Amino acid sequence: MLDSVTHSTFLPNTSFCDPLMSWTDLFSNEEYYPAFEHQTACDSYWTSVHPEYWTKRHVWEWLQFCCDQYKLDANCISFCHFNISGLQLCGMTQEEFMEAAGVCGEYLYFILQSIRSQGYSFFNDPDETKATLKDYADSSCLKTSGIKSQDCHSHSRTSLQSSHLWEFVRDLLLSPEENCGILEWEDREQGIFRVVKSEALAKMWGQRKKNDRMTYEKLSRALRYYYKTGILERVDRRLVYKFGKNAHGWQEDKL
């Protein structure tokens, strides 16, 4: 059983929940968060226990790990919303993550769910994890995108256009002139579709993401992660997918 960590262990008995404050502000402020030697993920204790048992400090270390390892823009993340235990963190929905961290929220949610399902093995192959996350995540959330921090707090999904893989697939289905027989509807009303030309789809997505090494195996792995978020639903047929309850824009009467 982990030692319990009270709110006063790291924080003063004053209200600090400023909506504009990022968690990195507190990492750099010893009044709130005493300095500690940063460890690599595999050397850190929090990586060896289930996220539900993380203390608040472990949650902070996890956030720092995500920003360092996957080049997330820390200015997007509101520390106020992550001053919680691991159990509370695991109880957050994807929508709550996006409310707390803007476009980075979906990225953080995906990483957490991967750690919960894979355990310590998640940290054994960081390059493979990065490749999968790159296929899945919103690239506008990366530091290298040059996006301004205030833009990270805009939660409008319409501005993302086709930066997500599932949106790219949706838009391709809705654009016969660009589709070229790569995808086809099996049941338009139910949102069920089939990948007809798998490698052509992977090549087209790779060109958009400037990734010459994209394969359908990698692309399909990224698509399967959408099962966890309700964007796609599993269909027990090869190369067949279905839009889920959290997908939008594919219905004919809601375009």
UniProtKB/Swiss-Prot annotation:
Record-annotated PNT domain positions: 33-119
DNA-binding region: 163-244
Biological process terms in GO annotation: cell differentiation; regulation of transcription by RNA polymerase II
InterPro entries xrefs: Ets_dom, ETS_fam, Pointed_dom, SAM/pointed_sf, WH-like_DNA-bd_sf, WH_DNA-bd_sf
SUPFAM superfamilies in UniProt: SAM/Pointed domain, Winged helix' DNA-binding domain
Localisation: Nucleus
Main localization, broad class: nucleus
Annotated keywords: Activator, DNA-binding, Nucleus, Transcription, Transcription regulation
The keyword Nucleus appears for this protein: yes
Molecular functions per Gene Ontology: DNA-binding transcription factor activity, RNA polymerase II-specific; sequence-specific DNA binding
Organism superkingdom: Eukaryota
An annotated GO cellular component: nucleus
Coiled coil: none
Domain remark in the UniProt entry: The PNT domain acts as a transcriptional activator.
Physiological role: Transcriptionally activator that may play a role in regulating the later stages of keratinocytes terminal differentiation. Binds to DNA sequences containing the consensus nucleotide core sequence GGA[AT].
Family assignment from sequence similarity: Belongs to the ETS family.
Name of this protein: ETS-related transcription factor Elf-5
Protein species of origin: Bos taurus
Gene encoding the protein: ELF5
